[in-house]
């Protein structure tokens, strides 16, 4: 979640453990006189993946809420994985606002005054249940460039990225903090563990290690903070005794963790 004032929060993606996250962070709790609700003013979805959307069900008693997403994501969430359809029965449901995939189309979610959001089209894949699986169109996955209007500082959030296009590289160059896809250490990781027959890139994720990986990409840019996010439990960087973890530390790349706070 991001905030410009520490009082109103915009939730970026809604993971399955959202209730636990809210219970652990008093910043999201409502004022004492509010019988039902949170300090979440709006939601921004970057894709229609299960791990980024099922937390919407947790928010059902606090609806209506504005949700910002691309039209492609909204289509998935009303057809292939119809959370929007289900939730419309709670107090008017989610009020969908379309995100234009044009990088120059800035927007400000409700409650985020003082911050400017820009969509960054990411080359990734749609969820397995989507009609766009392996038939990728702009809007299946986006990153977010978030700029503080007062300081001009920039945060770039890119949770699912198979390869970096020119816009991604441009935004990285302009950023003070980059939160980037760290799902898998190696492209063959899920195959090697016997969990899938697909490469990381088949699923839409750039491996962290190796030529063309996230480490090599991040090292191209002089960014104050580089943080890997969206880390799968098969990823060896989670073992702090591993050479992979120490390699990251030596290169100034951080691992995200639950409850991590970043001020930009």
Give residue spans per PLM region.
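Short glycine-/acidic-enriched loop or helix-start segments at secondary-structure transitions
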Residues: 21-23, 54-56, 78-79, 129, ...
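Metallo-beta-lactamase
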Residues: 1-15, 71-142, 146-157, 253-258
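Pre-active-site segment of Zn-dependent metallo-hydrolases
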Residues: 1-44, 48, 54-60, 164-171
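Alpha-helix termini
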Residues: 4-5, 26-36, 85-89, 148-150, ...
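Structured loop/turn residues at beta-strand edges in well-structured enzyme cores
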Residues: 38, 48, 92, 113-115, ...
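Cap/insert and terminal regions of metallo-dependent hydrolase folds
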Residues: 139-141, 149-154, 162-259
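Active-site neighborhood of phospho(di)ester-bond hydrolases with catalytic His/Asp-centered motifs
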Residues: 11-15, 39-51, 69-70, 156-161, ...
């Amino acid at each position: 979640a991001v905030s410009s004032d520490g009082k109103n929060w915009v939730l970026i993606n809604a993971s399955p453990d959202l209730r636990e996250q809210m219970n652990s962070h008093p910043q999201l709790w409502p004022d004492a006189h509010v019988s039902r609700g949170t300090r979440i003013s709006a939601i921004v979805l970057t894709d229609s993946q299960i791990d980024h959307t099922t937390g919407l069900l947790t928010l059902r008693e606090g609806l209506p809420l504005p949700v910002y997403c691309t039209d492609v994501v909204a289509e998935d969430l009303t057809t292939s994985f119809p959370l929007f359809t289900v939730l419309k029965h709670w107090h008017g449901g989610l009020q969908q606002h379309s995100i234009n995939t044009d990088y120059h189309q800035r927007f400000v979610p409700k409650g985020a005054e003082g911050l400017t959001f820009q969509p960054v089209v990411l080359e990734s894949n749609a969820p397995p249940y989507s009609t766009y699986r392996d038939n990728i169109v702009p809007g299946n996955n986006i990153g977010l460039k978030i700029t503080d209007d007062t300081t001009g500082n920039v945060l770039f959030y890119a949770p699912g990225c198979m390869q970096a296009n020119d816009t991604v590289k441009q935004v990285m160059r302009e950023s003070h903090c980059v939160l980037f896809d760290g799902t898998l250490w190696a492209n063959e990781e899920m195959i090697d563990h016997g969990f899938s027959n697909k490469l990381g890139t088949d699923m839409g994720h750039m491996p962290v290690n190796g030529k063309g990986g996230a480490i090599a990409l991040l090292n191209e840019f002089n960014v104050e903070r580089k943080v890997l996010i969206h880390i799968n439990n098969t990823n060896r960087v989670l073992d702090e005794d591993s050479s992979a973890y120490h390699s990251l530390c030596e290169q100034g790349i951080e691992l995200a963790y639950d409850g991590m706070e970043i001020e930009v």
